[in-house]
Amino acid sequence: MVVEEKRLVSHEIHLKQRPVGMPTESNFELVKVNVSDLKDGEFLVRNIWMSVDPYMRGRMKENKSYIPSFQLGKPLEGGCVGQIIKSKNNQFRVGEYVLGNFGWREYWISNYSNDVMKIDPNMAPIQWYLGILGMTGLTAYVGLLKIGELKGDDGDNNNNTIFVSAASGAVGSVACQIAKIKGFRVVGSVGSQEKVKWLLDQAGIDYAFNYKEVGENNVSSELRKACPNGIDIYFDNVGGKHLEAAIDNMKVFGRIVLCGMISQYNLSSLPAGPSNLFLAVTNRLNLQGFIVRDHYNMLNEFYADMSKWISEGKIKWNETVFEGLENAPKAFLALFKGENTGKMLVKIGSDALV
């Protein structure tokens, strides 16, 4: 008698409705699906960690962007780390760990593409490949060194000031510490006194303030106090009032790195732009946006530098973790409420599955 192998079932988070304004848990749906049988050249991955990132909010909208919108009734996507549990591909063996873009689900099948990369679990905790050793770290690195034209080790950096908004977040916290490694004076804005303390005591920056306590309309005056000689580079993760305040305080020929604008992602209608943009003309400012995937040619340089800084203890890395795939929507919503310090992650499965 032939005994049929029991079909593997995977849980996935689907986009049920497109959010208007701030997302709610009702926009998401936990779904059970059958996992297909493997074809030649394919391998099956069980996810262990998944990343939750602000850019995902943009993909929930139905508009043209640099990356396709999420589809209704389909699983969401995002960075993930998992372990191969079945394989019909000689290059990808059972037990190996891989980095992919198929988060928001328990299992996924790949036939290998440029979006899948093997990772070494002995080099660092596997979830770091979603953060400090992944796109998060690379975003901070590219933003400062390439877009912000940050020059290091020239002996004059103590006279130079960098301002980072959302400074205790995943990208912001790395940007702060890279700037300190390069010898710059660093000022950071965050949304709680606990985060102020982390930036000063752990990340080692020079000045941090709670914009909620100061008041968004008073960020400019707070920056005048924190940066009496002006700002050389502003690493913008927030947009809105923070961007306007930074423009007020930039030095002549200052650089503004437009990385993200989390203050605007959930607005149903966009506010007017900065009222002081003419200062970009008179002060000859450079404002440049960027998308990290345009700069993958810097990966080897990034890995070399970041690995060295981590081994030397120069980078402090923090994570906020939600347990269980079913809590991924809660983690996503918490991100926009400022409830994370460092990288927001969801732990889906145990570290060793095979």
Residue ranges and their predicted role:
Residues 2-10, 314-321, 329-354:
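C-terminal capping/lid region of NAD(P)-dependent oxidoreductase domains
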Residues 34-52, 60-104:
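Glycine-rich beta-strand-centered segment in the early N-terminal region that forms part
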Residues 71, 76-83, 91-166:
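NAD(P)H dinucleotide-binding glycine-rich loop of Rossmann-like/cofactor-binding domains
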Residues 106, 191-201, 270-277:
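Short, glycine/polar-rich helix-capping loops at beta-to-alpha or helix-loop-helix junctions
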Residues 137-138, 166-176, 239:
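Glycine-rich NAD(P) Rossmann-fold beta1-alpha1 loop
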Residues 150, 227, 250-251:
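A generic alpha-to-beta junction signature in SAM-dependent methyltransferases
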Residues 180-245, 293:
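Adenosine-nucleotide cofactor-binding segment
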Residues 238-315, 348-354:
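Glycine-rich phosphate-binding loop and adjacent beta-alpha segment
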